[in-house]
Amino acid sequence: MDQLEHLSLVSKVLSEVENHFGVVEKDVAEFVIHLAQENPTFDKLKKALDSQGLGDQFDDSLTATILRIVQSMTAVKKKNKKGGDSKEDIKDSHKITLISDAKEEIKARLPALAMANTAKEKEDNEDDLMAQLEKMEGRYESEKRLQKESDSKRNRSRSRSRSRDRKRRRSRSGDRDRRRRSRSREDRRDRDRRDRDRDRDRGRGDRRGDDRQRDRRDRRDDGGARKSEVAEIGKIYDGRVNSIQSFGAFITLEGFRQKQEGLVHISQIRNERVQTVADVLKRGENVKVKVNKIENGKISLSMKEVDQNSGEDLNPRETDLNPDAIGVRPRTPPASTSSWMNPEASGVGQGPSTSIGGGKARVRISTPERWELRQMQGAGVLTATDMPDFDEEMGVLRNYDDESDGEDIEIELVEDEPDFLRGYGKGGAEIEPVKVVKNPDGSLAQAALMQGALSKERKETKIQAQRERDMDTQKGFSSNARILDPMSGNQSTAWSADESKDRNNKMKEMPEWLKHVTAGGKATYGRRTNLSMVEQRESLPIFALKKNLMEAMIDNQILVVVGETGSGKTTQMTQYAIEAGLGRRGKIGCTQPRRVAAMSVAKRVAEEYGCKLGTDVGYTIRFEDCTSQDTIIKYMTDGMLLRECLIDPDLSGYSLIMLDEAHERTIHTDVLFGLLKAAARKRPELKLIITSATLDSVKFSEYFLEAPIFTIPGRTFPVEILYTREPESDYLEAAHITVMQIHLTEPPGDVLVFLTGQEEIDTSCEVLYERMKSMGPDVPELIILPVYGALPSEMQTRIFDPAPAGKRKVVIATNIAETSLTIDGIFYVVDPGFVKQKIYNPKSGMDSLVVTPISQAAAKQRSGRAGRTGPGKCYRLYTERAFRDEMLPTPVPEIQRTNLASTLLQLKAMGINNLIDFDFMDAPPLDSMITALNTLHTLSALDGDGLLTKLGRRMAEFPLEPSLSKLLIMSVDLGCSEEVLTIVAMLNVQNIFYRPKEKQDHADQKKAKFHQPEGDHLTLLAVYNSWKNHHFSQPWCFENFIQVRSMKRAQDIRKQLLGIMDRHKLLMVSCGRDVSRVQKAICSGFFRNAAKRDPQEGYRTLTDGQNVYIHPSSACFQQQPEWVVYHELVMTTKEYMREVTAIDPKWLVEFAPSFFKIGDSTKLSTFKRNQKIDPLFDKYADANAWRITRVKKRIYNPNK
């Protein structure tokens, strides 16, 4: 029986081998079965085959298939021997079906996520720099040689060949290197992109022998003796004059397998005017020509752009862009750029738009006019050069039949998937967003949806009320209509005085409730105390455990510290580490999840340490570095420490790293967990401290190698939990009622309300203020204090001030008050049970903020805020059943619900390709990683094998999202890096324009001066350039309703990015008036955000067919271009596109060939297939009135 089962196994394996190799070898099958039995996992079997020299012949799919057959047959054999069918046997059999380990199974299915890690070496950067220097040297030598040849042209003899030979013998090695570099650029275009980096050295070595046998000058352009298939645009070829015509000459190109013939127009022969072609060229004459254009198989050539003696290109231009050509080609900027730099001076904003296609603008000719022109041309009245559509650059008439404005072009998504994803590339676009709600049909989820509708309704009500106020204002101004008259001398003084008054007030119109909160702008901010700095430090709960904590730091490499918010962990532990002597070998680093926290904490610690901020104590956030060489305590965002790991994975400059607020589980913190854990293994002297304010410290301890837990006891008092009896549909209104109820009926004590964002907080402050105002002076005063990220930090500090006697304070905050802030005097907490979370939508490819229910852990943390000062109450505006059944135990980590493209790009840049084995605390979903890898591949950051390209390596160096990084790098090749650098800096700053309510029309008029017809990105560029031309003036910003702080922030960001570009030798080049280059660069980075105008209304995105709209404030709102790309989507009353730019649809295929393709004109496109065709009808009648069933039938009445 065993022999029969073995023969059956051999037969199955033999059939697989025969199908794969076409050879029947029983010995090979038995040998492979033996290896599979000895090596039961995929990796082990693969290594065994490699050791036997069979790894190249047995691919992954064949290896996995053989392993599955052997293990399944072996499991059946064992089961038959035992004769039982127990649950354990079935379980074991199920486990061994393919691969025993779950990770091994994932590796077998997705090898792209389990590629071997590569060590990050400095030689890569050195090779890149050397390659750039070699290119620069080659250009310099070429220019120098051309200058010498032109100087000695008159004295040169006929024996040019011998002189070249003598010169070649004198500098043979130098020319050989230049020859090899020149040809390597040509060969790299022909090689497969995936193999370029791996085969670079091998290809150079193979070509070394060929270089010795070739003449450099004669064969530089055609790549040696190899015959080409087709001509390429921009290349120079040798040719022979075949025939001469009155309008030009036909040239037969040499060096091709098949005959290639092109036309040199009479205008392209010489720079000066040529009367007769026969006077300049003769039949059979050898010439050098450059390919200018190839259209419908016809080749347009030029002789005037080529040196007929040396074959040098006299007018070099860019060919098709290679995604990896990120470089260093210099470009001569246009002579005049002043009008574009200052749109106010020349009225660029109101001028005609630059043609999208670049080059010569298209001339519109009607059909009758074209017929008349052709008749006149046939009669000999007009020549070809007199035609209005004659292209002087190409020397031919433009074929307008093949051109369009994008209306007839259909762009479709490429269905092909990258090779390294092997059948999983399409799945990434089909997955649904990550579920962060336990019960989507529960009362909490329904309340969140209802609040979204109510929020939209509130916004529309405010807009309508504002319009009514504007109408009343205009009616009031009817008697003083001359106030806006520029010719009115009497009113100009009053108007300028009014403007200066606005400037003094910073044009901020405070709502009445906000004026009451800030005491009319005269309130004093800051937490007042009479204690000295030493007494304040000693009053913290952590001070009592100082000695024990310092001993724990010294004795343990990794330490988990748990303490309540306000115990002093963030400010004191770094100073304790210095006192314990841990700062002698390196800096003390502390990460913060928020930029504001890193800045404020560093400022506080510098005051306690007795130094100036930026010296011994400093901070680093994105685009701002406030440290020096003497800094020993450094606070930073977790993202900045992750970028430092990109340069130094071992963090050799640090002796202690403290991950503060680790319980928030941001995406950067989760990645740092794995990186710091690996760094601690390599560096035993590196200390790690993980702090948490919640009770999940056991999970951190288990992850960090059973690290000891140090607990700082806090002051906690009992808290009474109160639930609602029925679910609340409008939790915002329920919160208002609860606050009023507490204020009117409960004993003294402050109130803390948790809401989701600024809009809800402002609305609540306004509603509570109006309700308290309506109750009259007899009711005790309620001090309303908002807290959210956009609020000025000096105003946020007022929440710490105790309420005066006889008054109650209500603090309305986001979830920042859960763990990051400790407010004394809070006895009552109102918890609606919601929070805004960033969730990635794979269909749109973007992150969006969604209101979701909180977790049970967050609910407990919120209720604990009421028990810091004394016994308190927590009013939960949801049912107890909802808490138990509709809330997750812990929040979903950010790494499992957001876009991973930027994170995976940084891991790839660190050499971490094996994402399956990376030590995540909570691994992200496989679908999310597949989607991120697919996104990076479409951005050309990854090649066909899933490895990082040179472009991807450069993208990882910029502290930007991948699309912005590619946009910035590609602008160098497109010759517009000066402009794109400014645009990227402005995109990283929000709220550039200010729109005061009482002068909205005036602000809109000022903003319209900067509008560019190409779109909002170029409008931002015009704003910055105008500010620059006015010497970065602050009064100029006030006059034009522009935020000064935002502009200065954009200026700082631009300086930071400029330093990075200089470090990577990326040239700063201006495009001048040719703004189509800027549009192309924007398209190359944001092609995924392309949208086409919908015949019904608005636009439809190309990726998921979603209905989106251009915002009325956009520069493109009036033009409504056919094709646009946008920066991001903003959901208000509609899905509005933010920062829109018009594009040519052909650019999508040009810059994203792996993502878009031109649709088949013979088939119905996906875009049109999704469109709805509505029948025509009378707009004054019912929509279905035209149907025959709706027509009233006349009944014949014989009595009439």
Swiss-Prot record:
<feature type="domain" description="Helicase ATP-binding">
    <location>
        <begin position="550"/>
        <end position="713"/>
    </location>
</feature>
<dbReference type="Pfam" id="PF00270">
    <property type="entry name" value="DEAD"/>
</dbReference>
<feature type="binding site">
    <location>
        <begin position="563"/>
        <end position="570"/>
    </location>
    <ligand>
        <name>ATP</name>
    </ligand>
</feature>
<dbReference type="InterPro" id="IPR014001">
    <property type="entry name" value="Helicase_ATP-bd"/>
</dbReference>
<feature type="short sequence motif" description="DEAH box">
    <location>
        <begin position="660"/>
        <end position="663"/>
    </location>
</feature>
<dbReference type="InterPro" id="IPR048333">
    <property type="entry name" value="HA2_WH"/>
</dbReference>
<dbReference type="GO" id="GO:0071013">
    <property type="term" value="C:catalytic step 2 spliceosome"/>
</dbReference>
<dbReference type="InterPro" id="IPR012340">
    <property type="entry name" value="NA-bd_OB-fold"/>
</dbReference>
<feature type="domain" description="S1 motif">
    <location>
        <begin position="234"/>
        <end position="304"/>
    </location>
</feature>
<feature type="compositionally biased region" description="Basic residues">
    <location>
        <begin position="155"/>
        <end position="171"/>
    </location>
</feature>
<dbReference type="InterPro" id="IPR027417">
    <property type="entry name" value="P-loop_NTPase"/>
</dbReference>
<feature type="region of interest" description="Disordered">
    <location>
        <begin position="480"/>
        <end position="504"/>
    </location>
</feature>
<keyword id="KW-0217">Developmental protein</keyword>
<dbReference type="InterPro" id="IPR011709">
    <property type="entry name" value="DEAD-box_helicase_OB_fold"/>
</dbReference>
<dbReference type="InterPro" id="IPR007502">
    <property type="entry name" value="Helicase-assoc_dom"/>
</dbReference>
<feature type="domain" description="Helicase C-terminal">
    <location>
        <begin position="738"/>
        <end position="911"/>
    </location>
</feature>
<feature type="region of interest" description="Disordered">
    <location>
        <begin position="305"/>
        <end position="360"/>
    </location>
</feature>
<dbReference type="Pfam" id="PF04408">
    <property type="entry name" value="HA2_N"/>
</dbReference>
<dbReference type="InterPro" id="IPR001650">
    <property type="entry name" value="Helicase_C-like"/>
</dbReference>
<keyword id="KW-0508">mRNA splicing</keyword>
<keyword id="KW-0539">Nucleus</keyword>
<dbReference type="GO" id="GO:0003724">
    <property type="term" value="F:RNA helicase activity"/>
</dbReference>
<dbReference type="GO" id="GO:0048589">
    <property type="term" value="P:developmental growth"/>
</dbReference>
<comment type="function">
    <text>Could act late in the splicing of pre-mRNA and mediate the release of the spliced mRNA from spliceosomes.</text>
</comment>
<dbReference type="InterPro" id="IPR049621">
    <property type="entry name" value="S1_DHX8_helicase"/>
</dbReference>
<dbReference type="GO" id="GO:0007281">
    <property type="term" value="P:germ cell development"/>
</dbReference>
<feature type="compositionally biased region" description="Basic and acidic residues">
    <location>
        <begin position="184"/>
        <end position="228"/>
    </location>
</feature>
<dbReference type="Pfam" id="PF07717">
    <property type="entry name" value="OB_NTP_bind"/>
</dbReference>
<dbReference type="InterPro" id="IPR044762">
    <property type="entry name" value="DHX8/Prp22_DEXHc"/>
</dbReference>
<keyword id="KW-0067">ATP-binding</keyword>
<dbReference type="Pfam" id="PF00271">
    <property type="entry name" value="Helicase_C"/>
</dbReference>
<dbReference type="Pfam" id="PF21010">
    <property type="entry name" value="HA2_C"/>
</dbReference>
<keyword id="KW-0507">mRNA processing</keyword>
<dbReference type="InterPro" id="IPR003029">
    <property type="entry name" value="S1_domain"/>
</dbReference>
<dbReference type="GO" id="GO:0016887">
    <property type="term" value="F:ATP hydrolysis activity"/>
</dbReference>
<dbReference type="InterPro" id="IPR011545">
    <property type="entry name" value="DEAD/DEAH_box_helicase_dom"/>
</dbReference>
<protein>
    <recommendedName>
        <fullName>Probable pre-mRNA-splicing factor ATP-dependent RNA helicase mog-5</fullName>
        <ecNumber>3.6.4.13</ecNumber>
    </recommendedName>
</protein>
<dbReference type="GO" id="GO:0010172">
    <property type="term" value="P:embryonic body morphogenesis"/>
</dbReference>
<dbReference type="GO" id="GO:0003723">
    <property type="term" value="F:RNA binding"/>
</dbReference>
<comment type="similarity">
    <text>Belongs to the DEAD box helicase family. DEAH subfamily. DDX8/PRP22 sub-subfamily.</text>
</comment>
<dbReference type="GO" id="GO:0005524">
    <property type="term" value="F:ATP binding"/>
</dbReference>
<keyword id="KW-0378">Hydrolase</keyword>
